[in-house]
């Protein structure tokens, strides 16, 4: 257990969070998918919706035999829209999936596997140019579809790390990503706790899938698990408004349930939310 004064050391804080959560909750089985292309589809569909809705949309694509680049390519745009309708923003998402497949066809012969064989920085740069792909979506594709050693920053990880004072309220996406990657560089994922050692309060995890169980480099597996653990923590304990710290594996690391929620941090969060809302409005008009 780390002393509370050590919470100002971002790397040490991140490592302690990872160790505690992985011991308490075990493997998270992310990403729940059967192929790299399914991961890509899920990364698009999960934008601005719950994973439950994504699962409904993916089930529709699978039933239609369209959960592949060829399947998306051959579908009419209206048919694709209807299949992914449960995920919300279905017209924009259908257009973006079509554009991604067109990119895949023009650069990599329609093969997502060929794309993912390229260097991490090269793929990331290409993905970020595409309509509807921001850093979180690009990094989800890289980490979960291609096993590239890159951390996915989302609202959950940002919230947890802010409250534990590992990052500031106005930290940029890549700043947070690099802090986590640096902190977990030496962690090993080869030894995992058995189910008998897990906390009785362990949240429900996804069933193991072909993609979640694929062989990975140890560092990639750590980054994979860390993201899944942050998601669980954000959903079940570190809520936006009323965090449930009493049964949280990290509860004793904070002197107050929400940490030092200073006026400066609140102003920074408000400014970031306002900026994100403007950016979201701009993107969805494209």
Which sequence ranges carry the predicted segments?
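Catalytic cores of DNA base-excision repair glycosylases
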Residues: 2-267, 283-284
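Acidic, low-complexity intrinsically disordered tails
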Residues: 267-286
């Amino acid at each position: 257990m780390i002393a509370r004064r050590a919470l100002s050391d971002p790397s040490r804080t991140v490592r302690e969070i990872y160790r505690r959560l992985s011991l308490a909750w075990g493997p998270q089985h992310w990403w729940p998918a059967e192929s790299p292309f399914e991961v890509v589809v899920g990364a698009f569909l999960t934008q601005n919706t719950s994973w439950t809705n994504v699962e409904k949309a993916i089930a529709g694509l699978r039933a239609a035999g369209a959960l592949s680049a060829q399947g998306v390519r051959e579908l009419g745009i209206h048919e694709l829209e209807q299949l992914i309708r449960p995920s919300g923003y279905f017209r924009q998402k259908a257009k973006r999936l079509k554009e991604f497949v067109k990119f895949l066809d023009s650069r990599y012969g329609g093969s997502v596997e060929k794309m993912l064989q390229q260097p991490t920085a090269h793929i990331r740069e290409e993905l970020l140019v595409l309509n509807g792909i921001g850093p979180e979506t690009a990094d989800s594709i890289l980490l979960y579809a291609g096993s590239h050693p890159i951390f996915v920053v989302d609202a959950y990880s940002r919230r947890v790390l802010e409250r534990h004072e590992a990052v500031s309220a106005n930290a940029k996406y890549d700043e947070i990503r690099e802090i986590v990657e640096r902190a977990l560089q030496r962690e090993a994922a080869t030894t995992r706790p058995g189910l008998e050692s897990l906390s009785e309060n362990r949240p429900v995890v996804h069933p193991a899938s072909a993609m979640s169980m694929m062989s990975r480099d140890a560092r990639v597996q750590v980054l994979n698990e860390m993201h899944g653990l942050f998601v669980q923590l954000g959903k079940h304990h570190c809520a936006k408004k009323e965090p449930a710290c009493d049964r949280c594996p990290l509860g004793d690391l904070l002197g107050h349930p929400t940490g030092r929620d200073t006026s400066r941090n609140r102003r920074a969060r408000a400014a970031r939310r306002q900026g994100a809302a403007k950016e979201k409005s701009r993107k969805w008009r494209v």
